[in-house]
Amino acid sequence: MRDFSYYAVKEQFHRIADGGAVLTDYDFKYILPDKDITTGENLELDFYVEGENNTPPSNIYVLIGKNGIGKTTIIKKMLKTLLCNNDLHTYGEFITGWGGNFSNIVNISFSMFDDPITEVDVFDKMIFYKYIGLIDVRYENDIRKRNVKYDQLPDMFFESYWNVIKSITKNELWKRSVKILETDSTFKELDIGSWISQEKSKLEKMILATEKSIEEKNNIEKNFFREIINNQFSKLSSGHKIILLTVVNLVNFVEEKTLVIMDEPEEHLHPPLVSAFIRALSELMSYRNGVAIIATHSPVIVQEVPRRCVWKIRGHGKYRKFEHPEIETFGENLGEITTEIFGYDVGSTGFHTILKNVADRKNSYEKALNEFQGELGKEAKSILRAYMYDKENT
């Protein structure tokens, strides 16, 4: 025991007693099939996750760069490398420091134009794989049916939610995650904890009034709460629906040595909720000893992770280069991060001036975005989010 600090031992055993994982350091690298034109060598991305004494956390890595630089392509190749038949290293190669594979892989993307890997595509059946998104993988080749309808989202949420609240460990983790998300005032107003608690007495009276079997009573309980939860969920904004759907599935499916891969989670969220989500994700990854890799345009996300966990992608044409930012990013000013990542001074270009002027006049990201009538590129949206976030937090 003398090789471990009192704090580390106390925290580890407390976490294990609560159903969490033993936190260990681990590392892995992804070797791309693409070459660095300047050296002729394969491009590499290195990842190192620290278990204990991990402040700021190193369990979230970010791939960031200008629009069109290839972030989404890279994470898709990562997924194919891990999940598909890759004997010839067509999609690249993962090398893990522990010599094994990830236990779970969770792929999160809410793009309507996504082309996700399905469970049928998974070559190594020992790996648990879960896709969370807006494509119904049962009909991925049928353009009429492939997109999940918004009226299907409540049931998608409820099925995972029901599994979570029926598990003591998962339910506790869910409550912790919601508490972190509630640091965003708009999320706190949802009062998610009351959705079920206010109706429990009504359910108890219903069940006491019946003489049905335990199985039938369980079905009554599930259907009773399904109606309540679906009704509450249906009232939410699209951003709140997506964040809840994401978090409840992460709580449900993330286990030790899980790799979570996410594509542009900021697309549906306003900046304060982006920050809260990243903190909740990091807490969950720490509890389960997992790691997340996020492809993003968002300086707000970069602000939540240290420099060593940010891979900046640069290049043009066939040329690609991966490097860490020159500045420390955790908690850094968003203007400094934007300048570092996108390579120009905030306010030095024409569209920046317009974005800043609109941000100064509006009191929410949604209102600022509406000002542009759908005519903003992804990069500009990220910068507008950063301006609004700075405004709301000063």
Give the role of each language-model region.
Residues 1-54, 99, 112-119, 134-241, ...:
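Extended helical coiled-coil dimerization/tether regions that scaffold
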Residues 10-14, 86-95, 385:
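Short alpha-helical segments and helix-capping/turn motifs at coil-helix boundaries
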Residues 38-93, 221-354:
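Switch/communication elements of ASCE P-loop NTPase nucleotide-binding domains
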Residues 88-120:
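AAA+/P-loop NTPase substrate/partner-engagement loops
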Residues 110, 127, 133-136, 315:
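Active-site donor-binding loop signature of nucleotide-sugar glycosyltransferases
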Residues 118-129, 308-311:
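Short secondary-structure boundary/capping segments
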Residues 148-185, 197, 283, 300-303, ...:
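RecA-like P-loop NTPase motor core
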Residues 202-206, 276, 361-366:
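Eukaryote-specific, cytoplasm-facing alpha-helical/coiled-coil scaffolding segments in long proteins
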